[in-house]
Amino acid sequence: HPPVAIEDFFIAEQIEDYYLLFGQLVKYKRADLAIEAFNRLGKPLLVIGEGEMLPQLKRMANDNIRFLGKQPFEQVRHYLAHCKALIFPGVEDFGIVPVEAMASGRPVIAFAAGGALETVAEHTTGLLFREQTPESLISAIESFEQIQSKFSPESIRGHAKDFGRNTFKRNIKQVIDAQLSEV
């Protein structure tokens, strides 16, 4: 997996009352699941990103969902650091955004597939939902609301460091050293 610039993110003193969906708004990222779930829950959701699904998602969304479009990195950092949790409903080979949220000390609520299985440590750095349905996501969010105080921003950030540049460099060096020792 690619290295993530953990040091570019920070832990906020105050968490605000919103969940965050961040990324390209294309079909396979399944933002529609998040929109449907948050329409039913009525909880605040901020959506950062652009893409072919944006017009359809805006038409679907109730007033508790705000679309912020593309944002500069400084704003993205702010929203990541202050959200209750990142919502990650799609399947990615790796998925850098969940690790960026964790680098900000924030839990991730992700679909249990692809890279999220490697990056999200259940009940330590977030929660996984097992079916790619609004109902399954709603259930995970409701569970999160019951236990959110148990998540430690420092522990979450510590876990993110496993995917940082220093770990990446160390792992690459070990692979190269092992190959060179066989020559």
Regions of interest found by a model, annotated:
Residues 4-46:
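Conserved donor-binding/catalytic core segment of Leloir-type glycosyltransferases
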Residues 54-77:
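Nucleotide-activated donor-binding/catalytic signature segment of Leloir-type glycosyltransferases, i.e.
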Residues 78-83, 172:
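Short alpha-helical donor nucleotide-sugar binding micro-motif in glycosyltransferases
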Residues 81-93, 106:
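Acidic donor-binding loop of glycosyltransferase active sites
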Residues 87, 107-112, 120:
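Short hydrophobic beta-strand element within catalytic cores of glycosyltransferases
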Residues 132, 149-178:
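A charged, aromatic-enriched C-terminal amphipathic alpha-helix characteristic of glycosyltransferases
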